[in-house]
């Protein structure tokens, strides 16, 4: 496994007294080059006028509703009455939509000793998808490593291909240009069952990111049906666009204990008001990935920095559960500075609940890996280390293996 000795982690081991908080904030301020980067001065630590994070009350619920109405869209249905579990498959609409699960279990797991679960969304290699052979080989190797890493610690790893729920990228773009009679069976997935395909889409109709998050919730339904899996200790994680999905899943479904976004960028952890040159913009997302968000999001394209609510507030909706935000130092498009800054700003929601927020042993964690936009075993290792606290487990795989002796 590749090591990154210079990775930037935000993991203070000592208690957070006032002096340590000041020292930590100064360090982060220096790393972010606040004078050059922050476009809204009231966001800088130590200045007056920093808005208080919402409490877990009607105000916070109002922020959640705003994002569903104006950004991600609303799911038209919860758990379908006709949903069936057939082994490791979830059948919806009489089998018109099938979510196929790749499940890896740790040794010694049983209904008497259920294990925590890490749920990973994929869109490339869980099952055959159009991907170049050399890239597919790399992706499969990384997934094998993820399985090993999770199961060695005593966690189950569940993966599924989000294209089973709704089409993405080239599929969506190709389908939208085809005549209806030439589309493959159920080409639109859950959109075809419950609405959301391009024709007749309303302003707050769910986009693909919300639909994939809905799929995660259906996988959680399946997890709850399995006695060998502990549905109270489930983490959802994803990379890039699927990192956005992990955050939406955690906010919209409180059964998930942990949400982890890796390089999620705009539409995920990166705040719109902290845009700087080189970082993706909302207008780009809606031009080239028109299906990700709901149509109402387009009204903010011309002035996204002045949206009524932003992603640090969205991240705060995970409180009082657990949040982990990972970035890559050279992933300019995702904006690692903004991602990490939003996570620390969101942390104040936990602190208002008298819970430890930002920090490795707190409820909010994160790291910045040196390198490009990627989801590596190193990222996954740091996240599994973080999960030791919410899962109530040991940190090292060696200690976890001893539990099975």
Please place each PLM-identified region on the residue numbering.
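Bacterial N-terminal signal peptides
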Residues: 35-45
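Short hydrophobic alpha-helical segments enriched in small aliphatic residues
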Residues: 5-7, 14-17
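Short, Lys/Arg-enriched N-terminal segments with co-localized hydrophobic residues
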Residues: 16-25
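Cap/lid segment of the alpha/beta-hydrolase catalytic domain
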Residues: 121-218, 222-225, 268-274
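Mobile cap/lid helix-loop segments that gate and shape the active-site cleft of serine hydrolases
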Residues: 258-314, 335-344, 348-358
């Amino acid at each position: 496994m590749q090591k990154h000795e210079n990775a930037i982690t935000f993991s203070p081991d000592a208690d957070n007294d006032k002096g340590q908080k000041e020292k930590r904030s100064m360090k982060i301020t220096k790393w972010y080059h606040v004078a050059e980067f922050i476009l809204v001065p009231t966001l800088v630590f130590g200045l007056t006028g920093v808005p208080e994070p919402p409490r877990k009350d009607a105000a916070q619920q109002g922020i959640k509703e705003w994002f569903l109405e104006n950004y991600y869209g609303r799911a038209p249905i919860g758990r379908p009455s006709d949903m069936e579990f057939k082994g490791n498959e979830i059948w919806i609409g009489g089998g018109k939509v099938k979510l196929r699960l790749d499940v890896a279990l740790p040794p010694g797991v049983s209904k008497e000793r259920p294990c925590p679960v890490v749920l990973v969304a994929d869109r490339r290699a869980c099952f055959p998808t159009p991907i170049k052979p050399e890239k597919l080989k790399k992706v499969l190797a990384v997934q094998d490593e993820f399985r090993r890493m999770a199961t060695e610690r005593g966690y189950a790893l569940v993966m599924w291909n989000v294209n089973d729920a709704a089409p993405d990228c080239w599929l969506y773009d190709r389908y939208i240009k085809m005549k209806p009679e030439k589309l493959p069976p159920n080409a639109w997935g859950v959109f075809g069952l419950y609405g959301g395909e391009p024709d007749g889409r309303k302003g707050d109709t769910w986009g693909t990111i919300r639909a994939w998050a809905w799929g995660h919730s259906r996988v959680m339904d399946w997890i709850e049906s399995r006695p060998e899996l502990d549905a109270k200790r489930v983490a959802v994680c994803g990379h890039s666009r699927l990192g956005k999905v992990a955050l939406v899943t955690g906010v919209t479904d409180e059964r998930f204990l942990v949400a982890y976004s890796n390089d999620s960028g705009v539409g995920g952890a990166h705040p719109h008001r902290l845009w700087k040159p080189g970082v993706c913009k909302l207008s780009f997302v809606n031009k080239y990935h028109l299906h990700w968000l709901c149509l109402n999001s387009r009204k903010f394209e011309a002035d996204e920095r002045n949206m009524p609510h932003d992603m640090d507030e969205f991240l705060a909706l995970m409180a009082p559960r657990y949040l982990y935000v990972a970035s890559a130092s050279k992933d300019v498009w995702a904006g690692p500075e903004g991602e990490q800054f939003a996570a620390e700003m969101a942390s104040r929601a936990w602190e208002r609940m008298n819970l430890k927020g930002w920090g490795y042993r707190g409820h909010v964690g994160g790291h910045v890996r040196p390198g490009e936009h990627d989801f590596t075993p190193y990222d996954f290792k740091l996240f599994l280390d973080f999960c030791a606290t919410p899962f109530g487990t040991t940190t090292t795989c060696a200690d976890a293996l001893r539990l099975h002796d």
